[in-house]
C-alpha cells in the first residue's frame, strides 16, 4: 500500500489464537527498510519485536508498545494503546483506519454503505457520478433518492427492537416517540413509455449491485483506498462485471487497490487482467484455504489460463460426484 508517494508492505502470519509473525517495511528507495518485525516465541509464550532505525522511537516508547503487544493483537493496535511520540506508525494506522474498506458482503451492509455515502454527498458529486455510471452501464435510471419511511410501533415492539443485536449499518434512526425510521432508495426511470419510480425492493439485484459498486468506485478513486469485495460478480452479467473492472483500471491514477474474489472464469481470458494479479484458492485436507499465484504455475505466455484451468493444469477443479442421486 502507499502513503503519499511512499510504498509500504505489511506481512502477517496468524491464526485465531496468535500472530506468529508481523513485519512492516517501507521503501525510501528501491530497497526496503525495516520499521519493525515481531515474532512469537511459542516455547515461552512471549512476543519479541525488532525495531528498525527509521521509526526513531525512544527505548521507553519501544518498551511501552512491547508491553501492550500481547500474542493475538498487532503491533499497530498495541501502538494505539501506548503513550508514545509521533512516528511513521501514525501514518500507517491512519491509512488502515480511513482508507481500508473491508469486505461488504450482506445486502443490508451494502445498502447501508451506499446510503451513508450518498447521504453525506453535500455537493452532489457522488450522485452525479453514480447516475452517469449506471446510465453508461445501460440502465435507464434518471435519478436516485433516499426516502425516510415511518412505521408506528407499540411500546412492546420498541423494547424488543432496542434489545436486538442488530448489525452495524442497519439504518434505523432509533424509535423516537414510538416511530421506527427506516431509509430506503427510490429509483426514477426514464423510458420510451414514460417516467416512473421504483423502491429498492422492486429493483433487480443486479441493478442494486451496480449502484453499490459505483459508490465504491467513486470513493476508491477519490480516496486512494484499498477495497476488498467478496464475490464481486454477484447478480451481475459478465459484461457489467468486466465494465466495472475496466473502468477502475482506466480511471485509477492513484494508489487505490481493488481486491476481490470471483467464480467467473471468463476473467481468465481477458488481457486487461494481469496474470501476476490472479490467485487461485484451494482447500487443503485440514480445510484451510491455500492461495497460489497464477504466475507460479510456469504457464507459457501463449497458453490460455482459462483453457489450462478447465483442463485441470492449474488449481484442482472441484470434485463432483455423479449427477444421479440415489
Locations of regions flagged by a protein language model:
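Electropositive, glycine-dotted interaction segments
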Residues: 3-155
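Conserved ABC ATPase signature
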Residues: 162-218, 232-236
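Catalytic Walker B motif of ABC-type/P-loop ATPase nucleotide-binding domains
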Residues: 227-230
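Short, mixed charged/polar active-site loops
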Residues: 7-9, 31-33, 193-197, 288-289
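Short polybasic amphipathic segments
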Residues: 20-26, 183-191, 279
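C-terminal lobe/lid and adjacent interdomain/linker elements of RecA-like ASCE P-loop ATPase modules
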Residues: 223, 243-326
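Short, surface-exposed charged micro-motifs
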Residues: 9-11, 175, 280
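Short alpha-helix of the ABC ATPase nucleotide-binding domain corresponding to the H-loop/switch region
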Residues: 237-242
Amino acid at each position: 500500500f502507499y502513503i503519499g508517494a511512499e510504498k509500504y508492505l505489511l506481512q502477517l502470519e496468524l491464526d485465531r489464537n496468535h500472530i506468529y509473525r508481523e513485519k512492516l517495511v517501507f521503501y525510501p528507495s528501491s530497497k526496503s527498510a525495516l520499521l519493525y518485525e515481531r515474532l512469537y516465541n511459542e516455547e515461552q509464550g512471549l512476543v519479541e519485536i525488532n525495531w528498525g532505525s527509521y521509526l526513531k522511537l525512544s527505548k521507553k516508547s519501544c518498551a511501552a508498545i512491547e508491553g501492550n503487544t500481547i500474542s493475538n493483537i498487532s503491533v499497530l493496535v498495541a501502538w494505539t494503546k501506548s503513550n508514545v511520540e509521533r512516528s511513521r506508525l501514525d501514518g500507517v494506522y491512519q491509512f488502515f483506519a480511513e482508507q481500508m474498506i473491508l469486505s461488504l458482503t450482506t445486502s443490508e451492509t451494502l445498502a447501508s454503505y451506499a446510503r451513508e455515502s450518498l447521504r453525506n454527498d453535500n455537493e452532489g458529486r457522488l450522485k452525479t457520478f453514480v447516475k452517469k455510471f449506471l446510465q453508461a452501464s445501460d440502465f435507464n435510471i434518471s435519478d436516485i433518492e433516499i426516502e425516510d419511511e415511518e412505521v408506528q410501533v407499540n411500546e412492546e415492539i420498541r423494547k424488543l427492537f432496542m434489545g436486538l443485536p442488530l448489525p452495524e449499518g442497519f439504518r434505523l434512526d432509533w424509535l423516537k416517540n414510538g416511530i421506527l425510521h427506516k431509509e430506503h432508495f427510490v429509483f426514477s426511470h426514464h423510458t420510451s413509455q414514460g417516467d416512473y419510480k421504483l423502491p429498492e425492493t422492486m429493483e433487480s439485484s443486479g441493478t442494486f449491485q451496480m449502484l453499490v459498486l459505483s459508490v465504491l468506485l467513486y470513493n476508491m478513486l477519490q480516496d486512494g483506498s484499498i477495497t476488498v469485495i467478496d464475490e464481486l460478480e454477484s447478480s451481475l452479467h459478465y459484461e457489467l462485471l468486466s465494465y466495472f473492472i475496466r473502468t477502475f483500471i482506466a480511471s485509477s491514477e492513484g494508489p487505490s487497490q481493488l481486491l476481490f474474489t470471483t467464480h467467473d472464469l471468463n476473467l481468465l481470458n481477458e488481457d486487461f487482467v494481469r496474470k501476476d494479479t490472479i490467485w487461485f484458492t484451494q482447500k487443503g485436507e485440514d480445510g484451510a484455504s491455500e492461495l497460489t499465484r497464477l504466475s507460479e504455475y510456469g504457464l507459457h505466455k501463449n497458453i490460455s489460463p482459462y483453457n489450462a484451468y478447465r483442463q485441470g493444469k492449474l488449481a484442482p477443479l472441484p470434485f463432483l460426484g455423479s449427477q444421479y442421486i440415489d
